[in-house]
Curated annotation (Swiss-Prot):
<dbReference type="GO" id="GO:0003949">
    <property type="term" value="F:1-(5-phosphoribosyl)-5-[(5-phosphoribosylamino)methylideneamino]imidazole-4-carboxamide isomerase activity"/>
</dbReference>
<feature type="active site" description="Proton acceptor">
    <location>
        <position position="8"/>
    </location>
</feature>
<comment type="similarity">
    <text>Belongs to the HisA/HisF family.</text>
</comment>
<keyword id="KW-0368">Histidine biosynthesis</keyword>
<dbReference type="InterPro" id="IPR011060">
    <property type="entry name" value="RibuloseP-bd_barrel"/>
</dbReference>
<keyword id="KW-0963">Cytoplasm</keyword>
<dbReference type="InterPro" id="IPR013785">
    <property type="entry name" value="Aldolase_TIM"/>
</dbReference>
<keyword id="KW-0028">Amino-acid biosynthesis</keyword>
<comment type="pathway">
    <text>Amino-acid biosynthesis; L-histidine biosynthesis; L-histidine from 5-phospho-alpha-D-ribose 1-diphosphate: step 4/9.</text>
</comment>
<dbReference type="InterPro" id="IPR044524">
    <property type="entry name" value="Isoase_HisA-like"/>
</dbReference>
<protein>
    <recommendedName>
        <fullName>1-(5-phosphoribosyl)-5-[(5-phosphoribosylamino)methylideneamino] imidazole-4-carboxamide isomerase</fullName>
        <ecNumber>5.3.1.16</ecNumber>
    </recommendedName>
</protein>
<feature type="active site" description="Proton donor">
    <location>
        <position position="129"/>
    </location>
</feature>
<dbReference type="GO" id="GO:0000162">
    <property type="term" value="P:L-tryptophan biosynthetic process"/>
</dbReference>
<dbReference type="Pfam" id="PF00977">
    <property type="entry name" value="His_biosynth"/>
</dbReference>
<dbReference type="InterPro" id="IPR006063">
    <property type="entry name" value="HisA_bact_arch"/>
</dbReference>
<dbReference type="InterPro" id="IPR023016">
    <property type="entry name" value="Isoase_HisA-like_bact"/>
</dbReference>
<dbReference type="GO" id="GO:0005737">
    <property type="term" value="C:cytoplasm"/>
</dbReference>
Length: 239
């Protein structure tokens, strides 16, 4: 199972949000590149980067920082936030991002999604962010009327191979992920599922591994040191 440390970018800094609320941010590192290098040194194989400003604006807003991270580390990087066009996808790939995460565009622009899947296949990951079972978009500011299960089924039909599922109410809370929703998702689709939001302990990670999750994204727990990245990597590797 892949372990992905999270770096959320806002105004060029590394921050954490609470339940997706932009007015509840905590700056965890003024220097995202340095943070990326710390995660690499601790043994991470892949980084998960979200351009929070971009998610709201609908276009990349921290591109230079993402490029600097890609240049500074040798491990792979997946990134998203505000990716709504083919040129935006190609820009991220050109600066060294290995996998591009789509969110809002996957729900609202199906022809675009189909085109990028045709062109880039498994390099495209779709992030499904849900609140009370329904999908949220535009940096979690807008709620839709489609359930996370229905969107996952649609993504599978289009040819998406990997999704990131986040229960927004759990994000940044250290209360554990939504195991029930993740289990239901796994029963309904054959996609590779990366779990995100609320992961707080080694026990959470072990339970996700027992559920055969493809990966897990860890953010706040690493910054607040309630989890040790090296220990998590060691335990998941030995299982």
């Amino acid at each position: 199972m892949e372990i992905l440390p999270a770096i959320d970018l806002k105004e060029g800094r590394c921050v954490r949000l609470y339940q997706g609320e932009f007015n509840k941010e905590t700056v965890v590192n003024e220097h995202p590149v340095a943070q990326a290098m710390i995660f690499e040194k601790m043994g991470a194989n892949r980084l998960h980067i979200v351009d929070l400003d971009g998610a709201v604006l609908g276009k990349s807003a921290n591109l230079s920082t993402i490029e600097d991270i890609c240049k500074a580390v040798r491990i792979s990087v997946q990134a998203g936030g505000g990716i709504r066009s083919l040129s935006a996808v190609e820009m991220l790939l050109s600066i060294g991002v290995e996998k591009v995460i789509l969110g809002t565009a996957a729900l609202h622009n199906r022809s675009f999604l189909e085109e990028v899947i045709r062109l880039y296949g498994e390099k495209i990951i779709v992030g499904i962010d849900a609140k009370n079972g329904y999908v949220a978009t535009r940096g979690w500011l807008d709620m839709s009327e489609i359930s996370y299960i229905e969107l996952a089924k649609q993504m599978e039909a289009v040819g998406v191979q990997t999704i990131i599922f986040t229960d927004i109410s759990k994000d940044g809370t250290l209360m554990g992920p939504n195991f029930a929703q993740l289990q239901l998702l796994q029963e309904e689709v054959s996609l590779r599922i990366i779990a995100s939001g609320g992961i707080s302990s080694l026990q959470d990670v072990e339970q996700l591994q027992a559920m055969n999750m493809y990966g897990v994204i860890i953010g706040k727990a690493l910054y607040e040191k309630t989890m040790d990245l090296q220990e998590v990597l060691r335990v998941t590797k030995s299982c």
